[in-house]
Curated annotation (Swiss-Prot):
Key word Metal-binding present: yes
Organism: Rattus norvegicus (Rat)
Residues that, per the record, bind substrate: 56
Family label: Belongs to the HMG-CoA lyase family.
Gene label: Hmgcll1
Protein's membrane topology: Peripheral membrane protein
Cytoplasm in keyword set: yes
Gene3D superfamilies: Aldolase class I
Protein name: 3-hydroxy-3-methylglutaryl-CoA lyase, cytoplasmic
InterPro entries, A to Z: Aldolase_TIM, HMGL, PYR_CT
Ranges for domain Pyruvate carboxyltransferase: 48-315
Protein's job: Non-mitochondrial 3-hydroxy-3-methylglutaryl-CoA lyase that catalyzes a cation-dependent cleavage of (S)-3-hydroxy-3-methylglutaryl-CoA into acetyl-CoA and acetoacetate, a key step in ketogenesis, the products of which support energy production in nonhepatic animal tissues.
Length: 343
């Protein structure tokens, strides 16, 4: 073939590249690769915790009910990828979210692997009681920085929701159950448009003061940009340390990874994502899924940031659930990798 141009060599070595450190995040023993050295110099976190929300946030908007055994197998596959947190279901009324009607069966059916946490979403005290009865040992509550979204999503005002959450969090803490808090519409609302950073800060501070160990700031509509992410985080971080914050980005406008990078540069090291980019929001028409876990891991691996997660195994779990629900993956990494395998 003679002397090949550099670009051609890269094409020929594409499969090999995918098998190397961008897949696993591993570097040569005893040495930092250039990406890891750069991450340390730039002040980026050395470790990023990924909170996998695919089984709950990813599937809850699916119109066709996913069989319980499929959900259980999906979660069991994710549990073997190195992920340390997998949000498995939601103890909400089946009238509001039919997809989550089998929450107790899912909770009782999964194999809970050592070192993996399995939080569930609860809307109120009744949901907490049902979750605990089903074996849940960690929960999350779901608030909003938008009055309109709060009323559409949980059928009450922000102030009313805070009253509910205070009861839930207090009760959970008495049972030594950790509580995570979500704040949706942190960068925009489908009904109100732009949301003032101060409003996000107020809601986040209240949840944190009640006892939530971590506040996940959600770009529910996926309209955020690195600029708006930076402005919002600067406001919230005046009241809550970055170590108690996470970001939850939807990719409607293709900004999720850029927004996540901005958050990492500001000291946040917890990121929510969903395998295959599953998700959406029934109360935010047009919003696409969460940032794909595969794409997030690929980016973090390429930056030399440790996640402890096996990209190949995550892709296999994504392939499983996409086939089960008859969907095409939204992960760019999965699309490119599967295509390369066929060539």
């Amino acid at each position: 073939m003679g002397n090949l141009p550099s670009a051609a060599k890269h094409c020929l070595n594409y499969q090999q590249l995918l098998r190397e450190h961008l897949w696993s995040g591993e570097s040569v023993a005893g040495a930092l690769d250039p990406a890891q050295e750069a991450s340390q110099l730039s002040g980026l976190p050395e470790y990023v915790k990924i909170v996998e929300v695919g089984p709950r946030d990813g599937l809850q908007n699916e119109k066709v009910i996913v069989p319980t055994d499929i959900k259980i197998e999906f979660i069991n596959q994710l549990s073997q990828t190195g992920l340390s947190v997998i949000e498995v279901t939601s103890f909400v009324s089946s009238r509001w979210v039919p997809q989550m009607a089998d929450h107790a069966e899912v909770m009782g059916g999964i194999h809970q692997y050592p070192g993996v946490r399995y939080p569930v979403l609860v809307p109120n005290l009744q949901g907490l009681q049902h979750a605990v009865a089903a074996g849940a040992t960690e929960i999350a509550v779901f608030g909003a920085a938008s009055e309109s979204f709060s009323k559409k999503n949980i059928n009450c005002s922000i102030e009313e929701s805070m009253g509910r959450f205070e009861q839930v969090i207090s009760s959970a803490r008495h049972m030594n159950i950790p509580v995570r808090g979500y704040v949706s519409c942190a960068l925009g609302c489908p009904y109100e448009g732009s949301i003032m950073p101060q409003k996000v800060t107020e809601v986040s501070k209240r949840l944190y003061s009640m006892g939530c160990y971590e506040i996940s700031l959600g770009d529910t509509v996926g309209v955020g940009t690195p600029g708006s992410m930076k402005t919002m985080l600067e406001s919230v971080m005046k009241e809550i340390p970055p170590g108690a914050l996470a970001v939850h980005c939807h990719d409607t406008y293709g900004q999720a990874l850029a927004n996540i990078l901005t958050a990492l540069q500001m000291g946040i090291n917890v990121v929510d994502s969903a395998v295959s980019g599953l998700g959406g929001c029934p109360y935010a028409k047009g919003a696409s899924g969460n940032v794909a876990t595969e794409d997030l891991i690929y980016m973090l691996n390429g930056m030399g940031l440790n996640t402890g997660v096996d990209l190949h195994k995550v892709m296999e779990a994504g392939d499983f659930i996409c086939k089960a629900v008859n969907k095409t993956t939204n992960s760019k990494v999965a699309q490119a990798s599967f295509k390369a395998r066929l060539e």
